[in-house]
């Protein structure tokens, strides 16, 4: 004798596998920067961003973009910076930015939140929000307010100190 028990479909029953059930959408945060000579400010921004999401995607500025904006190329080449950033604990994925459209990586990733570092100058919060809205994309954008103060809180300061120590002279970089 075979007994067949037919159980009604019930979302609350753990014994029933619902193939239509989708796992909850992971919240994605995106932050961007050069991340050339790593310092505590970078880690502060990355940790802040990760606290606001399940996944953190970091967009690294391309060497040519950095040269155009800052007037100098990064010390560490983009592919090497990408390897360094993607191995950091809070980072789930690192991608290189676009050479032609700074919004392209954002529109590709479609983050739930964009985190701007405290010294971010490439993106201004309201300007970025408006540019994304013009392209039909709405997302939360926050700026890290806490600026980590320490002797070497910027890549620029680290570079100046290296030159001072190695060349034994003070210089002003572009």
Swiss-Prot record:
It comes from the Archaea. It catalyses: FMN + ATP + H(+) = FAD + diphosphate. GO terms for biological process: FAD biosynthetic process; FMN metabolic process. ATP binds at residues 34-35, 39-42, 119, 147. GO terms for molecular function: ATP binding; FMN adenylyltransferase activity. Its cofactor is a divalent metal cation. It is an enzyme of class 2 (transferase). Belongs to the archaeal FAD synthase family. Homodimer. This is FAD synthase. The gene is ribL.
């Amino acid at each position: 004798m075979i007994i067949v028990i037919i159980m009604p479909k019930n979302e609350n029953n753990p014994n029933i596998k619902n193939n239509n059930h989708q796992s909850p959408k992971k919240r994605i945060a995106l932050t961007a920067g050069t991340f050339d000579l790593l310092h505590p400010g970078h880690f502060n921004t990355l940790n802040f961003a990760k606290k606001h999401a399940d996944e953190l995607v970091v967009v690294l500025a391309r060497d040519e973009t950095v040269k155009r904006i800052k007037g100098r190329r990064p010390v560490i080449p983009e592919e090497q910076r990408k390897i360094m950033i993607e191995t950091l604990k809070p980072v789930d994925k690192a991608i290189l930015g676009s050479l032609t459209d700074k919004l392209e990586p954002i529109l590709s990733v479609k983050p739930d939140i964009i985190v701007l570092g405290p010294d971010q100058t490439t993106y201004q919060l309201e300007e970025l929000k408006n540019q994304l809205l013009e392209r039909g994309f709405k997302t939360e954008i926050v700026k890290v307010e806490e600026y980590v103060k320490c002797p070497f809180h910027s890549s620029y300061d680290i570079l100046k100190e290296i030159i001072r120590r190695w060349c034994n002279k003070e210089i002003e970089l572009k």
